[in-house]
Amino acid sequence: MLPPFFLKRYIMKYDAVIFDLDGTLTDTLEDLKNSVNYALSEFGFPERSLEEVRSFVGNGVKKLIYLSVPESTSEETAEKCLEVFKTYYKEHSLVKTKPYDGILPMLCELRNRGVKTAVVTNKMQEAAKDIVRIFFDGFIDVTVGQVDGVAQKPQPDGINYVLQKLGVSKDKAVYVGDSEVDCFTAKNAGIPCIGVTWGFRDKSVLLESGADFIVDTPEEILK
């Protein structure tokens, strides 16, 4: 990792910037929490708090639900709960979800500079594409969510796929995310990671997980 005095100030010189979605470009936490609690209530399970759901996200919806149901829940019931969640979230993924402040101007500036952009997320593919289409149409070149044949983060498959699609080498790319999963994904792909502090994890988690840079605002990504 770079020395601490480099963490806040650096010059970005990349041909491609790849973003995580939840907690990085968009604040999806309320919709995720409400969908989780709807699914839990269908099985008579206790609800989860916003902070609990915050700590559970990052590894895909299956892990989210498996962490949300009571520990004694059978795999069969957990899978049924997962399906209820998927169905409900598909219809309610955009109720409160919105881009974080400063994201759209940052993406616009990247586009003006000719920088290619992509999203690699563990979110369900259809939901990810819907969010990108609604909020970032024209600003994201490739979106890869949870799809068959592409291993989820922290495996590097998604990053490798978009780099091939964009025609960009690893030494000209950077990954931007808000969690330890994102840091590990970038490391596994062999590219640097910019950790953002406005998402679902604390700055200390990002540093411990090996983030190469830390930014507190979207504007800092442009420096």
Positions of the model-derived regions?
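Metal-dependent phosphoesterase signature
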Residues: 66-105, 113
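Alpha-helical elements of Rossmann-like donor-binding domains used by nucleotide-donor carbohydrate transfer enzymes
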Residues: 34-38, 63-67, 84, 105, ...
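Substrate-recognition element of Asp-dependent hydrolases with the DxDx(T/V) motif
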Residues: 36, 103-133
